[in-house]
Amino acid sequence: PRSAIHQTLYSADTFAQHDYLAGKKLPDIARPQAGQTNWLHFVGINDAALLKYTLEPYGIHELVIEDILSRKQRPKIEDYDNYLFIAAQVYHYTAAGKLNSDQVYLIIGKDFVLSFQQKPLGLFSQLRRQMSENPRGILGKNTAFLAYCLLDRIVDDYFIVLEEYNNRVEAIDKSLFKDENSDILGKIHRLKRDAVRLRRTLLPLRDVFYQLAVRVDFTIFKGESTVYLRDVYDHNMQLLESLDASRDMVLSMMDIYLSFQSNRMNQQMRVLTVITIIFMPLTVITGIYGMNFDNMPEL
C-alpha cells in the first residue's frame, strides 16, 4: 500500500476532508482557514524530507520528527512550547495468531492535531468515516476533544486485542488435557509472551493518560476535556486489571499442565517398573541357562 495523508478540516460551521498520496511529488495540502481545526493523519510516511516539508508550518522540533521516523518508541508524552507529543503502540492478531505491533504518534496543538501510523491498519478510519457521515458531532469542538477521540480509539483497540487474547486463553484451557499431541506448552508460552508485550506497553501508556488527566500545565487540555481523559485513563486501568487476571490464568495453566505431565510420566514409570519386576526372574533364568557351559556344578 502507498503512503498517504488524510486531512480533516472543520470549524463551527464548516467541514471538509481530503486525501493525498505521498509519492515523489510533494502533496499540496490545503491550508486551514481562520477558526478551522486541522487534523492530518499520516500513514506509512518514512520520507524525512516529506515530513519536514509537511510539518514545517507547525514548528515541529527535529527530534520529534526523528522519533516519528523511528519504528520502536516506548509510550511517552513530551511537552513542547506550543504542542504535546505523544508516542503510543497498538497491537493486532494476524490470521496465523501472531501478535503484531504498530507505532502511533500524536502531535496536539492549539488548532491542529497530527497523527502518524506506519501500517495501514485503519485505526482511525472509522472515526474519519463517522465524521464524514455526521459532521455535526465534531463541528465546533476544539483540538482537545479531537485528541480525546483519537486516544479513546487507541484504548478501544486494546479491548479488541484483549478479547482475542482471552479467547485464545479459554481455547487452550478447554483443550489442556484433551489434545495430547498438540503443542500445548508452546501455545501457553506464546500467550505468556504476548501478555508481557501488552503489559509493557499498557503500563507506560497509563502514565501518559494520567498526566493528561491531572497536569494543569497542559493548557490544551483543561475544563471538560479532563473529564473525558479521566475516562480514557479508567479504561486503561481496566485493561491492565483484565490482562493481569488473564496472565495469572496462563501461569496457572502452565503449572497445571507441567504437573499433569509429571504425574503422567510417574504413572508410566510405575507401569514400566512393574513390568521390569515381572520379567526380571525370567531374564535371570534365561541368562543363566543361555551361558556356554557344558557342566554347571552349582546346578
Q: Where are the regions that the model predicts?
A:
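Non-transmembrane, extramembrane segments of multi-pass ion/lipid transporters
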Residues: K178-D179, V227, D248, S252
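Hydrophobic alpha-helical transmembrane segments and their immediately adjacent juxtamembrane loops
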Residues: D234-L299
